[in-house]
Amino acid sequence: MQRERSMKRKRRRRGIKDMCNRHDCEIPPDLMIEILIRLPTKSFMRFKCVSKQWSPLISGRYFCNRLFTCVTRQQQQQPRLYMCLVAKDKQCVLLSSTSPDNTCFVLVDQDLSIPGYFFASVPGLLCFQFGTKACIYNPSTKQLLTLPSVKSDITAQQGQLKTTQYYIGRDPVNDQYKLVCTILIYSKLFANMSSEHWVFTLELGGSWKKVVPLGNYHPHAPATAGRSIDGVVHYLAWVDLYKCAVVSFNIRSEEVTTFLLPRKIWDVPVPALMMKADLIEYDGKLAIFSHSYLKDEGLVELWVLKDAAGKKKWSNMILVLQPCQRHLVHGIDLIVKGTTQDGKVILSPLEMRSQFYILCYDVQNNDLRKVEITGVPRLWLHKECNFDLKFMDESESFIYLEI
């Protein structure tokens, strides 16, 4: 009797499975995608476990692109602020929120709590560095991916230091995301420098591959965060204590180049540790935002790179803050945190305690605006910590991570 009941249950389960498979086959993949993209984004990771047919659909690049197009059309893109706080004891928290207006962000969501510090982003992904390893986080799907360490070919000798820096970029032609690793060995005052580069493609079976620099390459020490423009990651770097260069890594061709900045960009020789400048995107072009005189004189110098017929030329402009806005920067050491989607430069105080805020500088209209950040957990308000800030549109985070 018991054996007969067991056989009936097996036949019933087999019948249900066959029925589900028949129904799956009756639904075309295109129709399945149109159904899925109307469901909540945060549920996709659970839906991947429903059937073998759903998993590759949700993981596929076509689904991500289709979802992005659908959401962008249906809703107005709302910028989301991500704020990473790292205490001296290495405790790390990632907070985020949308803005109800243009004057305040209220941090309400704690997305992540891991050791590490985020340092770069592309639409849809945030990157953290944990020791010598890189972690990639998708805020929408809550996926966290840790990449293997790079097995460097260069070794620090006695008295030398070794640092590792990561950058992330996207190849818009092949729709590929890649992580770039710069490893530096140097002595005091940037003497005896040696650097190498590795690249990791974010795809199934990806691994670190060493990059062979081109002939005009200079060993260098990275000085700023990376800025990704049209499939190329750029950052400022020092080739010695007084010479600065722009380093460019083409995500598609995996070529790294360096070109020295002309002396005219700096009025006087500035040692590396005193430089107050960063790269930004200005009107679709790479630019240097120099704010050495901002806190004392309310003055910003902007150098825009124009590449005509293979020749790189710099044009510059000087911006002077409106008198009514000088108090926002007077006597305050600021640091550049990138740009918003509409081109505003994000500035934040070098140190923030008890009160968190950013400054949004509209370079086109020479207008500076203060945006407060509230809702930071009380235990962080008077704690000595490092922080970083990134803006990302909510409709950008539909990338499935897999290696």
From Swiss-Prot:
One term under GO cellular component: chloroplast
InterPro entries: F-box-assoc_dom_typ3, F-box-assoc_interact_dom, F-box-like_dom_sf, F-box_dom
Domain F-box: residue ranges: 21-71
UniProt xrefs under Pfam families: F-box, FBA_3
SUPFAM superfamilies associated with the record: F-box domain
Disulfide bonds listed in the record: none
PANTHER family: BNAA05G37150D PROTEIN-RELATED, F-BOX ASSOCIATED DOMAIN-CONTAINING PROTEIN
NCBIfam families tied to this protein: F_box_assoc_1
Name of protein: F-box protein At2g40925
Organism in which the protein naturally occurs: Arabidopsis thaliana
Phylogenetic placement of the source organism: Eukaryota, Viridiplantae, Streptophyta, Embryophyta, Tracheophyta
